[in-house]
Amino acid sequence: MNINNPDIVVRHIKTKNKTRKIITYRSEDCELKTKHRRINTFLQERFIPSIFTKGYVKGRSIYDNALPHMYNDYFILLDIKDFFPHICHKQLAAKIFHEINLVKENQINKKECNYIVDCCSIGSRGLPLGFITSPILSNMYLKEFDCILYGYLKKMELNNVIYTRYADDIIISFKTDSFVEFKEIENNIVDTSKLLLSKYGLQINNRKTRAYNLDISNHVRITGINITKSE
């Protein structure tokens, strides 16, 4: 879709570290938002979200993202750099086709998938922050990633390993008795996450990568929720 669509309004919101470009709708009842509501309903009725994603899913919240980790001692927090703007349209269309036809075949064809991507995006790459369709499409995009990364973590045979994702925030926690072992595990997990994300055209934001050992730091903050070390 072209940025000059009359139903689109572009706003620039200043945050602490940068200015975000928010693309939203001219009005609640404009043609584009009405169209997006229909697309959203169609997708929500047919898409089964990853069990690991806690953001943008009805009935899940920041608490559901943090609480599964509360009994672990070691935490690795990763951030996907500029997640929405770097979503690949070709891959997204393929994932829509796969996910919508997963439970029941012939729910959607490839031409319709390409139409959804074109209708819900601006330019040749990414999803706009501000479109009501972007959250569910972003979860479709990373559902496969969630499952592959968790499978890798399970193969590492970590004690009580937990993985969750809230939009672009990745949280991994586990138990281990050795700090030296923790550093090795941390490096393996970060390297594997980077490699997997690169297949989706995405990168880790190295500045926001964090690792916590509750024996040292005593607490960790996950999507605004504090987890503290129990005595």
Segment roles from a protein language model:
Residues 29-77:
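Active-site-proximal segment of RNA-dependent polymerases
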Residues 202:
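Active-site or ligand-binding cleft "flap/edge" segments
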Residues 199, 221-231:
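Active-site and adjacent loop segments of nucleotide-processing enzymes
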Residues 1-10:
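Amphipathic alpha-helical blocks
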Residues 11-36, 118-139:
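Short, conserved non-catalytic motifs in the polymerase core
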Residues 55, 88-90, 225, 229:
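Regulatory and interdomain segments flanking nucleotide-handling catalytic cores
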Residues 68-167, 171-188, 192-197, 207-219:
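Conserved polymerase palm-domain catalytic core
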Residues 39, 134, 224:
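A residue-level signal for conserved active-site and pocket-lining positions in enzyme catalytic cores
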